[in-house]
Amino acid sequence: MTTLLADPVAQVIATAEELLSKRAGATVTLAEPEDLGGSGPAIVLRVRAVQNPFALPKSMVIKQVPEGGSEAAVLREVVSYQFANSLTAKHRPGPELVAYSIAERLIVLTDLGSAPTMSELLAERNRAAINHALMAWAQALGRMHVATVGREGDFAALLRRIDVKKTDVDPSQQRIGGAETIDPLQQILRSEYALEVPPALISRLQQTAELFGKGGVRAFSPSEVAPDNILVTEHGVRILDYEWGGFRDIVLDIAHALTVYPEFLGAAEREEVAELDDAMTEAWRSDVVSIAPGLADDETLARRVLDARLMWVWLATHEYFTVDVDLDDDTVAFGNPAPSHAALLGRWVALHAAAERVGDPVVAGHATDVIAALRGESLMED
């Protein structure tokens, strides 16, 4: 990470200084900016407060989304941090919100330090470190779910309090949604590969898609977070991306983690995915069974998780085929770009293996068909 002096960075710092000075009632001076990267066009900096009232942290992180980015994402991220601030440190999934300005599209957060990311730990060929990191991720999700179940009304109230007049921010809408992808992807699979999706599978997809917006055991979720947006600190797992935080069925979160983590592993470690999947799922269940007693049944758990994984792979497939066409919609703004051909194929292969382990011939058969189609396809763009 390098110290930055570029004008856009200076402007972000000046804006943050003004915001923090108003909040503290005294002059705040920030220095030594470090570029932390960021999703899309966002500027994310670590700064040190060299002139600092006692109440502010000595080191903070500033995030600003430039004009042209999704206003809804900024609003939802602010509300997600406000909501998370109400949780105890043990249950809070990420940094604390220090200050924000909707008008300036700027957020100031506590600094979590320079801990390794989940993706960096998964890339290490150290089975013990990988196992520890994945279990910490699963347990962090479980603790967060238990601490926030039943509080969707509080989150919705925070959204309403911001009083946005020109941006539609539905409290339940974290992404375009699974239901809207079912018919289009059916048509794509039919036209591109002459592949028909079994009606029984469509019914299951429709039922699972509803869980983004209603039903199920609903708790707070930072939304679909990639391993490179997760820090593994000495205090546990901390999630960095809240752009589409909200409430949804808890199974969707563990299923998303199971869907994305294997592509960050080395080839040898991928041979142990079945064991890692089971261990993660069990670590998560040990916490959430208190709020979702039905998941104590192994068959129920396996079916629910498999259906949710199917939904995530279906969504990724839809994004793979459509994201380059629909750059003006919110698909790109959700922070997870369309997967590469190799990553998408890997997700279908993993889904097939999971379906085989569960003994689900419908999902396994469909996955086999899609895998064959993708393997016969020329690479679109890696």
Task: Give each language-model segment a name.
Residues 309-382:
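ATP/Mg2+ or Mg2+-diphosphate-binding catalytic cores
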Residues 1-12, 156-209, 353-359:
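Active-site catalytic-loop/activation-segment of kinase and kinase-like phosphoryl-transfer enzymes
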Residues 252-293, 307-328:
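Active-site activation/catalytic loop segments of kinase-like enzymes and analogous catalytic loops
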Residues 41, 45-74, 120-123:
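ATP-binding glycine-rich loop module of kinase domains
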